[in-house]
């Protein structure tokens, strides 16, 4: 079942910001990666009910398998799932609750997503916010005090992000002409606001969602397991690369016929090609597994091919010789074009041959765009596109050495199978070594590789890989998609682009999501830097071998591989070397400047300058380290304070016990039963009585002594006062007589 979930997984849209208004929308007419074959299913009551949205065979298998597994579970499975459904209801149950709660809404309204939040009135009413195509609804039930609110999207005049108590950024305010509704306590305020804003703009522009688009958002919010049954006939599975709002156009039949005819003609013109795909299309695309297998933690590896390419060394020498000698001959060739478009772009082909069989008219554009996650590799190598394909996707010495460095083991390759839409896919199982301390030492990986039928030999290869990593933390929450794009730049130059995307089966918590993404992106960055470094070393080795060869061997090789007309001396363009100087081949010094990491989920692009992602990650790591140290210090301080408090309590209890009577004199809880026990009790009581009498005697004796001392002191005081009075009287008498 895991192999079929890719087609129903939502990809991030390039319209995830309010700045991308539907007015500025452009409808893409590029072919989708997955062929549209199969039965059609139309949403009931939709304005696009006449449009037919075909579902892929994989998606049909997914629904049938889920329904069969649901029926075959038996009573035990129903009993075991009942409690889980109560705690985590499926999308179908939520949609039924939505229709029961808001019966006044039209029957055509289908729930798209619901969020837990609170509505601010006299008090905060905790409940759930329901979003449909044309309505915003809220329901709260607090001790049987129900609150229902419905707002038509067309009636909304403003929608803003707000802060609760002017401090906490977790609120959204929706204003109509007469009312204001303040929703707060959102767990993911920005994501909720983006969804509400999209639906609001579509409602204002009167552009309803087509069935594919609606179910795309449902899958994006609820995952793949929707709990649907065969009774839900309005289900329309979205396309694999459905990532834009308003994309409801179908590709014209003429374009499909042209593509089919072109692919057929390419097959017929190549007698060595496979009946399924062009010759290089059926080669096992092995490297696709390597990058994506590093999520969510930093683990390495690369699977190995079973097939062996014979004569690989001679082919490498011939292509490298052809590259060097061909460029020298082309500098002397006449320029047939009236003008040359030279600039600082390093991706411009350097060959100017007038031969029509070399197809060097320019760089080939890939038939599919990069994924919307991050782009890790965007590099031009001095290999032909077929040679680069052989290095990366066959059992070449380069691949074996790289595998040994990445430490892969237990590799199992399943054979390629041709799908009904013309693509080819296979499953690879292998074991990787993990270095993250929070994960096990090893983990098993299941990878499903898909080579699209539009891939052509000597032109372009596009390979996608869906990677499921088991035995790692939260492995059931996410999976990864890697897209490898190999395009021809010149006859012996090709471009390798690798883009990755992290997709979620279930929406994790904020902390869990941060943990997954941190390990995922760091592992991929390390892997792809290593891959590009090894490719650059291999390229330098090939060029060095060419320079060591003799001139005669070079001449013989060049004449056998490539024949060109030598121009006359009077037809040579003057200063052609100076004109060609800006067009240079990639060097080792440029490697560090060509790997650009484009963060974000809206778009993937090539940035000409270095981004401070490494510094930012380092700063974040230092900040986390400081926070961890502060937390540890606080915990140690709390432990010390608790120990001091315990010591004081223990001393207080000990002091209290010393102030009480002897433990042996206390009345026991159990009364004496025998005469001996009574005698012991009386004896102890007598001792206690004697002790108390002795204490009182000592106290009384001490009191008597103190009283005697006090008496003596008072007598002395009295005598002193009398003597002073007598002296004063005698002095007074003397004064009288004199």
Curated annotation (Swiss-Prot):
Protein name: Protein Aster-B
Pfam families reported in the protein's UniProt record: GRAM (PF02893), VASt (PF16016)
Modified-residue entries (Phosphotyrosine), positions: 389
Phosphoserine found at: 28, 30, 274, 550, 581
Effect of deleting the gene: Mice exhibit deficiency in adrenal cholesterol ester storage and steroidogenesis.
Lineage: Eukaryota, Metazoa, Chordata, Craniata, Vertebrata
Segments of skewed composition (Polar residues): 8-19, 259-268, 281-295
Induction / repression: By NR1H2/LXRB and NR1H3/LXRA.
Region (Disordered): 1-81, 254-299
TM segment ranges: 623-643
Purpose: Cholesterol transporter that mediates non-vesicular transport of cholesterol from the plasma membrane (PM) to the endoplasmic reticulum (ER). Contains unique domains for binding cholesterol and the PM, thereby serving as a molecular bridge for the transfer of cholesterol from the PM to the ER. Plays a crucial role in cholesterol homeostasis in the adrenal gland and has the unique ability to localize to the PM based on the level of membrane cholesterol.
A GO CC annotation given for this chain: endoplasmic reticulum-plasma membrane contact site
Keywords for the protein's UniProt record, in alphabetical order: Cell membrane, Endoplasmic reticulum, Lipid transport, Lipid-binding, Membrane, Phosphoprotein, Transmembrane, Transmembrane helix, Transport
Gene3D superfamilies named among the record's database cross-references: Pleckstrin-homology domain (PH domain)/Phosphotyrosine-binding domain (PTB)
Tissue localization of expression: Highly expressed in the adrenal gland (at protein level) and brain. Also found in the kidney, testis and macrophages.
């Amino acid at each position: 079942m895991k192999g079929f979930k890719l087609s129903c997984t939502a990809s991030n849209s390039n319209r995830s910001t309010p700045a991308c208004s539907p007015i500025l929308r452009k409808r893409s007419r590029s072919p989708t990666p997955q062929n549209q074959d199969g039965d059609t299913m139309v949403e009931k009551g939709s304005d696009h009910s006449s449009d037919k949205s075909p579902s892929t065979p994989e998606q049909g298998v997914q629904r049938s398998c889920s329904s069969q597994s649901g029926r075959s579970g038996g009573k035990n499975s129903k009993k075991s799932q009942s409690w889980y459904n109560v705690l985590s209801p499926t999308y179908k149950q939520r949609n039924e609750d939505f229709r029961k709660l808001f019966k006044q809404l039209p029957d055509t309204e289908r729930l798209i997503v619901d969020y837990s939040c609170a509505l601010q009135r006299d008090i905060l009413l905790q409940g759930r916010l329901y979003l449909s195509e044309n309505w915003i609804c809220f329901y709260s039930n607090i001790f049987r005090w129900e609150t229902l609110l419905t707002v038509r999207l067309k009636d909304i005049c403003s929608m803003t992000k707000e802060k609760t108590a002017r401090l906490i950024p977790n609120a959204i305010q929706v204003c109509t002409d007469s009312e204001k509704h303040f929703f707060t306590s959102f767990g993911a305020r920005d994501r909720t606001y983006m969804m509400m804003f999209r639906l609001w703009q579509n409602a204002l522009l009167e552009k309803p969602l087509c069935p594919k688009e609606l179910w795309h958002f449902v899958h994006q919010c609820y995952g793949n397991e929707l709990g649907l049954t065969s009774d839900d006939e309005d289900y329309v599975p979205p396309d694999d690369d459905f990532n834009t709002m308003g994309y409801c156009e179908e590709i014209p039949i003429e374009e499909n016929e042209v593509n089919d005819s072109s692919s057929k003609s390419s097959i017929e013109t190549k007698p060595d090609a496979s009946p399924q795909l062009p010759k290089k299309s059926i080669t096992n695309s092995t490297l696709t597994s390597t990058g994506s297998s590093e999520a969510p933690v930093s683990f390495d590896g690369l699977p190995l091919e079973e097939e062996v390419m014979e004569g690989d060394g001679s082919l490498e020498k011939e292509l490298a010789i052809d590259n060097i000698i061909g460029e020298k001959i082309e500098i002397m060739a006449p320029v047939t074009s009236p003008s040359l478009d030279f600039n600082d772009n390093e991706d411009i082909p350097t060959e100017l041959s007038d031969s029509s069989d070399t197809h060097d008219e320019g760089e080939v554009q890939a038939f599919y765009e990069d994924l919307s996650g991050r782009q890790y590799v965007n590099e031009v190598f001095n290999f032909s596109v077929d040679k680069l394909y052989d290095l990366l996707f066959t059992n070449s010495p380069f691949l074996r050495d790289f595998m040994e460095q990445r430490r892969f083991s237990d590799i199992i390759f399943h054979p390629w199978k041709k799908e009904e839409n013309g693509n080819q896919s296979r499953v690879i199982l292998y074991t990787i070594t993990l270095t993250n301390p929070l994960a096990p030492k090893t983990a098993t990986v299941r990878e499903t590789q898909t080579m699209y039928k539009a891939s052509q030999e000597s032109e372009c290869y596009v390979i996608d890989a869906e990677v499921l990593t088991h035995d790692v933390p939260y492995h059931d929450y996410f999976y990864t998609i890697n897209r490898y794009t190999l395009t021809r730049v010149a006859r012996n130059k090709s471009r390798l682009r690798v883009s990755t995307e992290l997709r979620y089966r279930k929406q994790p918590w904020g902390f869990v999501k941060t943990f997954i993404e941190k390990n995922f992106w760091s592992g991929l960055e390390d892997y792809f830097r290593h891959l590009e470094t090894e490719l650059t070393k291999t390229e330098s080795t090939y060029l060095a071998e060419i320079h060591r060869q003799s001139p005669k061997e070079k001449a013989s090789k060049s004449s056998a591989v490539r024949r060109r007309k030598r121009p006359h001396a009077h037809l040579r363009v003057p200063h052609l070397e100076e004109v060609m100087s800006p067009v240079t081949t990639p060097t080792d010094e440029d490697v560090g400047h060509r790997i650009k990491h484009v963060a974000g989920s809206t778009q993937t692009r090539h940035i000409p300058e270095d981004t401070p992602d490494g510094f930012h990650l380092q700063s974040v790591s230092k900040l986390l380290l400081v926070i961890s140290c502060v937390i540890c210090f606080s915990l140690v301080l709390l432990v010390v304070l608790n120990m001091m408090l315990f010591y004081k309590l223990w001393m207080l209890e000990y002091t209290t016990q010393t102030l009480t009577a002897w433990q042996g004199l206390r009345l026991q809880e159990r009364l004496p039963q025998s005469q001996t026990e009574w005698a012991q009790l009386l004896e102890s009581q007598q001792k206690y009585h004697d002790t108390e009498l002795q204490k009182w005697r000592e106290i009384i004796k001490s009191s008597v002594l103190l009283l005697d001392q006090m008496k003596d002191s008072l007598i002395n005081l009295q005598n002193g006062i009398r003597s002073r009075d007598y002296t004063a009287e005698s002095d007074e008498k003397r004064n009288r007589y004199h």
